[in-house]
A protein has these predicted regions:
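Short connector loops at helix/strand junctions that flank enzyme active sites
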Residues: 47, 64, 119-121, 136
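Compact, glycine-rich, soluble single-domain proteins
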Residues: 86-88, 96-104
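Short tryptophan-centered beta-strand motifs in secreted/extracellular beta-sheet-rich domains
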Residues: 137-143
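Conserved short alpha-helical segments that host acidic/polar catalytic motifs at enzyme active sites
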Residues: 102, 108-109, 114-125
Length: 182
């Protein structure tokens, strides 16, 4: 296999960039956006959004940061074939994972180094579902607090919408980045 050199991003000001395309997200899943050993998104099919439409520094419920992303629903998405047969619905844990993914992406965007991991969630409520009839899933994150030290942590609340209707709410998510010991 050929050696792939990752681009250097030390001088890139990600905080001036407010939107990210699907191509950007795929680059992030390969470790090409924020640099080697920094926050990565999972690759498709586990990448749970197509684009990030907004990252806003002053906004959201806590007047810190807010992040919005979207996923266009296609009837042939892989999970509809198996969850459940003759009763297709997107697994609720995938919506939660999307919110964790988005919070982890935010830490990379903020310049926090290290690999991202979900550390927990306080409360999850499911009030609806995502079926093949849904056209667009929207994700919204409100960042409550960020700690930037040897391990960086983001604390956030989130919400998932199916065609504009709230279907999941999440409180007290914790996502962090850490530099693995060698």
């Amino acid at each position: 296999m050929a050696d792939i050199s990752l681009p250097k991003h030390e001088n890139v000001d990600f905080q001036s960039k407010k939107t990210f395309s699907n191509k950007d997200l795929i680059e992030c899943s390969r470790g090409l956006l924020f640099g080697e050993n920094n926050a990565q998104l999972p690759a498709p099919p586990m990448l749970m959004f197509d684009s990030i439409s907004n990252i806003e520094k002053e906004g959201g419920s806590f007047n810190k940061w807010q992040i919005d992303a979207e996923l266009a629903i296609k009837k042939d998405l892989w999970f509809f074939d198996c969850h459940f047969i003759n009763d297709p619905v997107m697994p609720g844990c995938f919506g939660l994972d999307a919110l964790w993914q988005l919070t982890g992406f935010f830490l990379g965007w903020l310049g926090c180094s290290g690999r991202g991991r979900a550390f927990g969630v306080g409360e999850v409520k499911f009030t609806g579902q995502i079926t093949p009839e849904v056209k667009l899933v929207s994700y919204h994150i409100d960042i409550k607090r960020v700690i930037k030290r040897q391990v960086s942590l983001a604390f956030s609340d989130g919400e998932v919408f199916a065609d504009g209707e709230s279907v999941y709410t999440v409180k007290n998510m914790k996502v962090g980045t850490f530099v693995p010991e060698e």
